[in-house]
């Protein structure tokens, strides 16, 4: 994933015991690595849901240019989720390269 163009990544209402939260849990594992936080200044916000809660997980991304993306991770696998988040990061990377 390209974290250099993301200011804030919020992974909310993750139930660690629910199959519906699988993509959100895997995204959290990728985003919480030391390199993501230290190199890029990524602001990572997480919240866990209790085992008995039926709330759906959600992923919110705020990019460097201010664009916001809200995704329902229950409807896709981790590959599609990271692809969706990276699509706009790649656009920002291309714009930056064109300005140089």
Swiss-Prot record:
Keywords linked to the UniProt accession: Mitochondrion, Ribonucleoprotein, Ribosomal protein
Gene Ontology cellular component terms for the protein in this record: mitochondrial large ribosomal subunit
* GO terms of molecular function: structural constituent of ribosome
Q: Which InterPro entries match?
A: Ribosomal_mL53 (IPR019716), Ribosomal_mL53_fung (IPR042776)
Instruction: Say yes or no: keyword Ligase present.
Output: no
Subunit comment: Component of the mitochondrial large ribosomal subunit (mt-LSU). Mature yeast 74S mitochondrial ribosomes consist of a small (37S) and a large (54S) subunit. The 37S small subunit contains a 15S ribosomal RNA (15S mt-rRNA) and at least 32 different proteins. The 54S large subunit contains a 21S rRNA (21S mt-rRNA) and at least 45 different proteins.
Where found?
Mitochondrion
- Name of the protein this chain belongs to: Large ribosomal subunit protein mL53
Q: Which gene encodes it?
A: mrpl44
Q: Organism source for this protein?
A: Schizosaccharomyces pombe (strain 972 / ATCC 24843)
Which family does the record assign? Belongs to the mitochondrion-specific ribosomal protein mL53 family.
**Primary role:** Component of the mitochondrial ribosome (mitoribosome), a dedicated translation machinery responsible for the synthesis of mitochondrial genome-encoded proteins, including at least some of the essential transmembrane subunits of the mitochondrial respiratory chain. The mitoribosomes are attached to the mitochondrial inner membrane and translation products are cotranslationally integrated into the membrane.
């Amino acid at each position: 994933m390209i974290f250099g163009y993301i200011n804030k990544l919020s992974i909310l209402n993750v139930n660690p015991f629910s199959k519906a939260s699988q993509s959100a849990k895997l995204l959290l594992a990728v985003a919480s690595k030391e390199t993501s936080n230290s190199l890029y200044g990524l602001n990572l916000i997480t919240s866990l849901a209790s085992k008995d809660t039926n709330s759906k997980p959600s992923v919110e991304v705020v990019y460097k240019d201010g664009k916001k993306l809200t995704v329902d991770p229950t409807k896709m696998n981790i590959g599609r989720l990271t692809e969706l988040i990276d699509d706009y990061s790649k656009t920002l990377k291309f714009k930056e390269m064109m300005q140089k």
